């Protein structure tokens, strides 16, 4: 086994004494830093490389802190209108994951970069910490690399805002296999529309 395989096995056993101590110390360190800051290098190089990261020019890593818990509806003084069934304020859950929120914040902060992917690096009772891989699409090392030229195209601008990253696709219900029949055709809406449209084919 290579070195990265050993690192992967270490990260799989998060309850081991070594990892518990490491994660505790790292969470303390991340809490002292700002909510969004550039990381000098990948905390999990094995995971980052599996997600497409390379330690070369044009690749950047940002660490993002996201507050855990549900989402409170932003209503002034709790004033909600309409039927009582829609009056909920507190016990609401956001449709997307905290990881996709971290990607969105990093992408908004670094508007000139493209979000490639992200991964978990730690959490405590209040926060979750993610590292987001961003790519500078104007760097010659990226533009001249045939494997990464796809992300330089304009269609991939702010892909994290449109649910095109791995974390964003999960909340959209996209995937392969019998668990993802609700999104056959590209989305939940497309699948619903096809199943609820009556087609009367002409008899010939």
UniProtKB/Swiss-Prot annotation:
GO molecular function: RNA binding; structural constituent of ribosome
Transport as UniProt keyword: no
Chief site of localization: cytoplasm
Signal peptide: none
Domain of life: Eukaryota
Cellular component terms per the entry's GO annotation: cytosolic large ribosomal subunit
Ribosomal protein among keywords: yes
GO biological process: cytoplasmic translation
PROSITE patterns, per the entry: RIBOSOMAL_L15E
Gene3D superfamilies the record matches: Ribosomal protein l15e
Compartments where found: Cytoplasm
Keywords annotated in UniProt: Cytoplasm, Ribonucleoprotein, Ribosomal protein
Subunit structure: Component of the large ribosomal subunit.
Protein family: Belongs to the eukaryotic ribosomal protein eL15 family.
Function: Component of the large ribosomal subunit. The ribosome is a large ribonucleoprotein complex responsible for the synthesis of proteins in the cell.
Protein name: Large ribosomal subunit protein eL15
Organism of provenance: Silurus asotus (Amur catfish)
């Amino acid at each position: 086994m290579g070195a990265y395989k050993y690192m992967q096995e270490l990260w799989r056993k998060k309850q081991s004494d070594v990892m518990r101590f490491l994660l505790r110390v790292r969470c303390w360190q991340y809490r002292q830093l700002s909510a969004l800051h550039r990381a000098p290098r990948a905390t999990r190089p094995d995971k980052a490389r599996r997600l497409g990261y390379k330690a070369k020019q044009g690749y950047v890593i940002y660490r993002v802190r996201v507050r855990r818990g549900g989402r409170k509806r932003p209503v002034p003084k709790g004033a909600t209108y309409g039927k009582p069934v829609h009056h909920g304020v507190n016990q609401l859950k956001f449709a997307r994951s905290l990881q996709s929120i971290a990607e969105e914040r990093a992408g908004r902060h670094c508007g000139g970069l493209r979000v490639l992917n992200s991964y978990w690096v730690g959490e405590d009772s209040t926060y979750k910490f993610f590292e987001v891989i961003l790519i500078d699409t104007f760097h010659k090392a990226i533009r001249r690399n045939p494997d990464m030229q796809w992300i330089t195209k304009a269609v991939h601008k702010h892909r994290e805002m449109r649910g095109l990253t791995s974390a964003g696709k999960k909340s959209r219900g996209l995937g392969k296999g019998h668990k993802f029949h609700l999104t056959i055709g590209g989305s939940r809406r497309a699948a619903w529309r096809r199943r609820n449209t009556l087609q009367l084919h002409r008899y010939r």
